[in-house]
């Protein structure tokens, strides 16, 4: 055999061998039923609603290996205004529209959730409940995955539980507005 024939035979043999290694699977357009969380992860969730009761987003908190993976996904487009929105865990698991902060003050939407959550033993800034900013697209949709080691599953469920809050903006006057809230729980 010539040198050229040897190269062709070797190449074809390699292709046949490699094709036997690849799985013949059809692609799927359906979402995966598995989570990105490590095996054995403990999960909490929250359904976020506006003050008028419209569903805005779902959130999951997956705890494994000493940190939480927080995933927030809008459930309906066009409810949240496009742009950056502050997002925090608040200290009380209540999401009541037109309510008063437990420490007093004027009524407002979701004030019953109290202040930003601070884990036991943590006194510094930023508060333990501060999360990454939610960036809402022009169509009103958003999807965020972030991680934190500032709190544990047990921290979020202790005492009065906790709530996840989306604010009207990241900075400025809208940052204080509470526009969506969901109580964090096991189901």
Please identify what each model-predicted range represents.
Residues 2-84, 89-187:
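N-terminal leader/targeting pre-sequences
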